[in-house]
Structures are given as C-alpha cells and as structure tokens.
C-alpha cells in the first residue's frame, strides 16, 4: 500500500487556484481509476484504489495547507506505513507552468504544506512530485501577489488551466513511474530539461 497525498486547501473558493494543484492531481488520478475521493479518514478525504498494479490510498487533507502534516501523519499511522510509502503532489512556484519535477527528498523551499509534513514527520526524506505553477507576476517581501490578490489563492485563467492540465497528466504518469520503476527512474524520466524549439 502506498499513500498518495495531494496538497491544497478545502473549499470551492480554492478549487482552481495554483495552490490546489496537488488536489487537482489527486482528482485526475481518481478520474482515471474511476473512484471518488470522498471517504473521511485521517483528517482527509480519501479513496482506496489500484494504480499501476499497486494498492494506493489517495488523500486530500482537510486541514488547510499549513497543517497538512497532521493529516499525513494520521494516515501513515492508521495505515501502518512509513515515509518510504508516501508520495506527495504539490504546487511549485520555481517550476514553469506545464512541467513537473520528481524528488526523493528536499527542503520545503517556502512551501508551508511541505514544511508542515516534514515538521510533523521529523524528516524531509519522502517522495514528492512538484507541479509547476510558474512565477507570479509580482513578488514583494515574500508575499506573492497578482493585481493586489494573492496569486496562489486566486482562480487560474483559462490558458493557465490548460497548461496546468498538461502538468497534471505528467504528474499522474510520474506517480505511475515511481510505483513501477522507483523514484530514481522517475526522476530520470521527468526531470530532463526540455530544449526550446528553434
């Protein structure tokens, strides 16, 4: 059994915001597996299914982003799993929209959901799939803003959603690669730099 967690904020007002890319990725996996992420368990909405020949529990924490670690720890404990059984999908400002990166471990790099998980689990050694949302139009004093609104929590425009859609497909393939080939092989496959077209 593997625990696959997407990070985001609960509530319809956050549904299609950049910060909810992790939730959207879980929804995409659920769609492919023909399940609904609706069972409440471990402070999250969950669905048990099979993906790439593996038993998995899909989860979307209901704790809000900054407390995601509480939900992840509760689920790992309930399922009697370790951090090696965890895959987390989340948004990443430092990665261009339409791309993803797979990592075996790493720092939070300012992401409060990741910081919460690492803090509660006491380690940064867990697999993550970072979904690129691109840089915000303006960054000042650590607050990411776009036209006076918080970029991360503002609904995405149609073109941005189209590009994010490509990232979500890649994220699903990356999860399948981690499950079937391992993290190293998934990193080799998905972390290659794309050469610009001439």
Predicted regions and their residues:
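Nucleotide and nucleotide-moiety/phosphate-recognizing core
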Residues: 1-108, 114-130, 135-150, 154, ...
């Amino acid at each position: 059994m593997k625990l696959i967690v997407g990070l985001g904020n609960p509530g319809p007002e956050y549904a299609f915001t950049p910060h909810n890319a992790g939730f959207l990725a879980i929804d995409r996996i659920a769609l492919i597996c023909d399940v609904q992420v609706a069972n409440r368990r471990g402070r999250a909405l969950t669905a048990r299914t099979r993906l790439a020949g593996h038993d998995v529990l899909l989860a979307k924490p209901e704790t809000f982003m900054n407390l995601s670690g509480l939900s992840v720890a509760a689920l790992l404990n309930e399922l009697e799993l370790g951090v090696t059984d965890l895959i987390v999908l989340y948004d990443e400002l430092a990665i261009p929209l339409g791309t993803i990166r797979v990592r075996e471990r790493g720092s939070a790099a300012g992401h409060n959901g990741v910081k919460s998980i690492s803090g509660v689990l006491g380690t940064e050694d867990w697999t993550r799939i970072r979904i690129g949302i691109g840089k915000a139009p303006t960054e000042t004093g650590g607050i990411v803003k776009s036209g006076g609104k918080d970029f991360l929590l503002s609904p995405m425009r149609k073109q941005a959603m189209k590009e994010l859609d490509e990232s979500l497909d890649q994220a699903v393939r990356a999860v399948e690669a981690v499950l079937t080939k391992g993290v190293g092989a998934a990193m080799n496959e998905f972390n290659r730099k794309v050469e610009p077209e001439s």
